[in-house]
């Protein structure tokens, strides 16, 4: 439901939605907000069938926008979507963890939780 974005000059922050904190995609992702790069997309409202995992806000803008969510189609197909993805976002450990976990979730696999797997992906 993209209908615009805020200026890339505004600092943007993202955080896990507390009601989604136990979702498998957020396994190992910190709950503190972190700075993201690029511009914050305006996508509200999202479909009622989605599960919003993270929201973001641009400095000086009160409206929070979904930045990561999931949906499961009528046939059971899993979808993960994020509006994050500026090249600098890939330097953020929590973003990489979320992205990795989303791939495992969509493939109906459990993300490895051991330290070696974590380090190879996300540190």
Residue ranges of predicted features:
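Extracellular ligand-binding/catalytic regions of CAZymes and related secreted enzymes
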Residues: 59-65, 72-123
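Catalytic beta-strand/loop cores that center a nucleophilic Ser/Cys/Thr
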Residues: 2-76
């Amino acid at each position: 439901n993209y209908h615009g974005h805020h200026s890339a000059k505004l600092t943007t922050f993202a955080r896990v939605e507390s009601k989604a904190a136990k979702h498998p995609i957020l396994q190992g992702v910190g709950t503190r907000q972190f700075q993201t790069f690029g511009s914050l997309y305006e996508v509200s409202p999202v479909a009622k069938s989605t599960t919003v995992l993270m929201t973001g806000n641009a400095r000086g803008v009160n409206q929070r926008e979904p930045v990561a969510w999931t949906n499961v189609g009528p046939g059971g197909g899993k979808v993960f979507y994020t509006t994050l993805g500026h090249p600098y976002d890939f330097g953020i450990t929590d973003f990489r963890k979320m992205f990795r976990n989303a791939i495992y979730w969509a493939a109906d696999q459990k993300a490895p939780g051991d330290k070696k797997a974590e380090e190879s992906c996300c540190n």
